[in-house]
Amino acid sequence: AAEIFGPEKFGAHLICGMGETEREILETCQRIKDMGGHNHMFAFFPERGSLMEEWPPVDRGQWRRVQLARFLIDYAGGDVAGMAFDHAGRVTDFGVDKAALEALIESGKPFRTSGCPGSLDEAVSACNRPYGDSTPTDILSFPFALEAPDVAAVRRQMAGEDVGAGFF
């Protein structure tokens, strides 16, 4: 795709939570970005009646860390080489200034839908299929700008708290 369409003209849709580590999916994001592409992320969401309906959904903390790191890679000059990971491949340091990271989390932008075209961070939620990877009561990719309670829930999920269905 990169050779045919050129830089900034292609992307890859990735599903997080199907057995890969955070490091593995973020290294894939970095390769796509380095080739000139865009990363579009979805959380694994086991659909009732599908062959994978018994698989567990993505861990919320994992999903939020991957969303944040992917946003840094795609839109904020982040690089997976500057991030730190633990022995299980979980992100332990995003490789950016703490104040900048806090401001980015507070903006809510990294946690919005990213499966639709957009080369600027302002355009990442051009999605017309909201709730493609979750239900309206357990939002994984927000199809709208986050408000303070949404950001608070995301922070709790990133801290490992089991915040999910019924909270929103």
Pin down the residues of each PLM region.
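Active-site glycine- and acidic-residue-rich loops that bind
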Residues: 15-27
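Auxiliary Fe-S-binding modules of radical SAM enzymes
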Residues: 4-7, 26-168
